[in-house]
């Protein structure tokens, strides 16, 4: 009997210990659930190794400063990330500029909003014939992209370069909006993918990075770089969320983790002047 009582005491002691241990572990998920609440999924498009390195740094900063786990979801085309955001499949996306977002919201009756600026990829006026914009002669031919948004952007670049003046108040400028052309420039409209190729046939051409990079255009070919001002604000790339979630603290913390000196340094390291941080421009 004595041995039986001892054995029973041992069994109950073990049971009691297991109950206490189980109770202790039951509090563990409370901390974990809080950590899960600090997870955010960011949608990007066709991320390059340079982009990945920048986002890795941002994720490390977000984790260190705010305890946020940043997950990156890569999409293959520009039609997917806004739909995924609107459907709740991701929390934020980072692939578009203000002009693209405005057009998407209008076409899709959307209410997505910018929560932070990232960078701008300035377009440039290139020439194979001249080294200085002041050397462009009277009657010179300047090529610009012929699609509405890129042509407008090119015309605003020519305006900021002092080559033409434009009618004020138009978000999208056209050749018809030119009010002054002191050098009597001939504006040649070509497909955006031809702007780099026609450089041998024109005096200068406005080319964006998509086509300047594969054409191996360099700073020595550059006459003028698009400035970051009120005319180019719509081309700044942004972090985007749904209107309902725009004021969430975690999103503002992600923006802060992105907009750092370290991120600026990485842009300079990987992109030089091709992509420029733009969060201090307003």
Can you say where each PLM-predicted feature lies in the sequence?
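Short, low-complexity disordered leader/linker segments with a strong preference
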Residues: 1-41
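Ligand-binding "clamshell"
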Residues: 103-115, 128-130, 201, 206, ...
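Short, polar/charged alpha-helical segment
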Residues: 39-71, 80
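Ligand-binding clefts/hinges and TM-proximal coupling segments of bilobed small-molecule sensing domains
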Residues: 25, 148-173, 255-282
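A conserved helix-loop-strand patch within extracytoplasmic ligand-binding domains
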Residues: 115-164, 264
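Beta->alpha turn/N-cap motifs
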Residues: 47, 76-78, 88-102, 191-192, ...
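Short helix-initiation/N-cap motifs at beta->coil->alpha
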Residues: 72-83, 170-197
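A bilobed periplasmic-binding-protein/Venus flytrap-type ligand-binding module shared by bacterial periplasmic
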Residues: 122-133, 235-248
